[in-house]
Design a protein with these regions (language model features):
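C-terminal lobe and adjacent flexible extensions of AdoMet/dcAdoMet transferase-like proteins
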Residues: 195-203
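A short acidic, Gly/Pro-enriched loop at the edge of an enzyme's catalytic core
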Residues: 88-99
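A short glycine-rich, Lys/Arg-flanked "PGG" loop and its adjoining helix->strand segment in the class I
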Residues: 113-125
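A short SAM/SAH-binding and catalytic strip from SAM-dependent methyltransferases
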Residues: 98-111
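Class I SAM-dependent methyltransferase SAM/SAH-binding core
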Residues: 36-38, 42-89
């Protein structure tokens, strides 16, 4: 990612994701105890965590993102420990957190299977994964458009896949569906309308 893109991305995220605040708040109401947030980013989730959360382990390799996110966390009064790493290789012990959170991150990781396996490793038995992500559109024509623009989209948006199909990755993982819904967010470009909001539990 270029320096310019890395510095602009926090503000792009804010503009795109703020309208989803109520949906994110509802999802994060299930967080508790020790939480790992994959891709803490600009800290948009910081003020949405309930009082049941003791601390947040913020996995965030981007210094410009962390500069914004850490300030928001401090303002929200959330205890946050930064981990400068990528989701495919988390420098955390097994069974070290109660809940993993991934909002608008799995679209950009290089190896979704490895990331989901790592999250399952670090989450304690009975723990949860809270997921909010844009996914492949069910309409074949739109899915084809998503795939066609993926190379250019990845360049413009830090490796993001506009229509990554998450089902094969989740089915191959150790996560079982607890609650799952697919919704369209129409304020976003049509190629990223379809989103999945879900809770999974370690199998």
């Amino acid at each position: 990612m270029s320096d310019l893109a890395e510095r602009l991305l926090p503000w792009v995220n804010d503009i795109a994701l703020r309208p989803a605040t109520s949906r994110r708040r509802a999802l994060l109401s299930h967080a508790h105890g020790d939480v790992l947030e994959l891709g803490f980013g600009s800290g948009l989730n910081a003020a949405l965590y309930p009082s049941a959360v003791d601390r947040v382990v913020a996995v965030e390799p981007s210094a410009p993102m962390w500069a914004v996110g850490s300030k928001r966390a401090a303002k929200a009064g959330v205890t946050v420990d930064r981990v400068d790493a990528f989701g495919e290789d988390l420098p955390l012990p097994d069974n070290s957190v109660d809940v993993a959170v991934s909002t608008f991150v799995l679209c950009s990781v290089r190896d979704p299977d490895a990331v989901l396996a790592e999250l399952a490793r670090v989450v304690r038995p009975g723990g949860s994964l809270l997921l909010f992500e844009h996914v492949e559109h069910p309409a074949a024509a739109m899915a084809a458009v998503q795939q066609a623009i993926t190379p250019a989209w990845k360049v413009c948006f830090a490796g993001c896949h506009p229509g990554r199909c998450m089902d094969p990755h989740l089915h191959a993982s150790l996560w079982e569906v607890e609650d799952q819904q697919d919704v369209d967010l129409h304020w976003l470009p049509p190629v990223i309308w379809r989103h999945r909001i879900a809770r999974y539990r370690v199998a």
